[in-house]
């Protein structure tokens, strides 16, 4: 009996350790009224990296900003939103062409969800074999959905040539995607498709346009620190001098 109990104890410990190492594949965190940050995960350079997206619950349905990086979480995100809010997703935006933003566009299009990117993002998606949206924006655009107004803004090249941000003026929520890095980050991340020379100028334009945001959402780091934009500018300035 003692050996049996010991075996069960070892099995329980191993199961617990495995569960802890894997962790949740989808995490949803409230930001403010009707605003939620969802996080999925993928592996980059042998390290598990979080990818933050956002969704907003409106009277007309739910709007998603960036799709899950983990391709197994396209449907679980929809299911979680339905279960939590009793709402369906009606629109999905991708803020640049990389797969951590666009991977779910085709899946969501097939589900009847309206998908959006800029023309520039669509060009780069087509060129690089990334998923593409149905509706294309050729300039900064203001949307009003279910009582919420938000706008897309292209401040210039940085992380990629096409990166845009989303701004909610009433709530002062700035969704920066991969353009803005976390306040604790030590570098600007992957720059293989970026523009190092213009990165700092792009971030400064963004800072000048949207003053005093109450929330700044970044793609791959902690989004609770409002120093993220200032810190990103400092890193971009240093990199631009090298």
Annotated model-derived regions:
Residues 1-22:
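Bacterial Sec-dependent N-terminal signal peptides
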Residues 22-31, 61-62, 69-70, 116-234:
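Metallo-beta-lactamase
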Residues 30-79, 165-178:
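Conserved beta-strand hairpin/beta-sheet module of binuclear metal-dependent hydrolase folds
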Residues 34, 56, 66, 81, ...:
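Divalent metal-coordination and catalytic microenvironments
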Residues 37-39, 55, 63-65, 90-94, ...:
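Structural recognition of the beta-strand scaffold that forms the well-ordered cores
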Residues 75, 79, 83, 106, ...:
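Solvent-exposed, polar/charged alpha-helical surfaces in well-ordered, non-transmembrane soluble domains
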């Amino acid at each position: 009996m003692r050996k049996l109990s010991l075996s069960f104890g070892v099995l329980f410990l191993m199961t617990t350790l495995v569960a802890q190492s894997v962790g949740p594949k989808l995490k949803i965190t409230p930001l403010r009224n009707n605003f939620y940050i969802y996080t999925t995960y993928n592996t980059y350079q042998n390290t598990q990296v979080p990818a933050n997206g956002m969704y907003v619950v409106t009277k007309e349905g739910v709007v998603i900003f960036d799709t899950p990086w983990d391709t197994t979480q396209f449907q679980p995100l929809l299911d979680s939103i339905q279960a939590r809010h009793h709402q369906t997703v009606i629109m999905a935006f991708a803020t640049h062409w990389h797969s951590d933003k666009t991977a779910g566009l085709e899946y969501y299009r097939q589900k009847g969800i309206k998908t959006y990117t800029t023309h520039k993002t669509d060009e780069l998606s087509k060129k690089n074999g990334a998923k593409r949206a149905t509706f294309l924006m050729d300039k900064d655009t203001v949307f009003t959905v279910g009582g919420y107004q938000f706008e897309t803004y292209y401040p210039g090249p940085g992380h990629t040539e096409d990166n845009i941000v989303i701004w909610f003026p009433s709530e002062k929520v700035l969704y920066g995607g991969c353009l803005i890095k976390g306040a604790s980050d030590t570098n600007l991340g992957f720059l293989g498709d970026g523009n190092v020379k213009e990165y700092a100028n792009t971030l400064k334009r963004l800072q000048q346009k949207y003053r005093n945001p109450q929330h700044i959402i970044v793609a791959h780091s902690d989004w609770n620190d409002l120093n993220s934009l200032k810190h990103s500018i400092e890193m971009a300035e240093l990199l631009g001098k090298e």
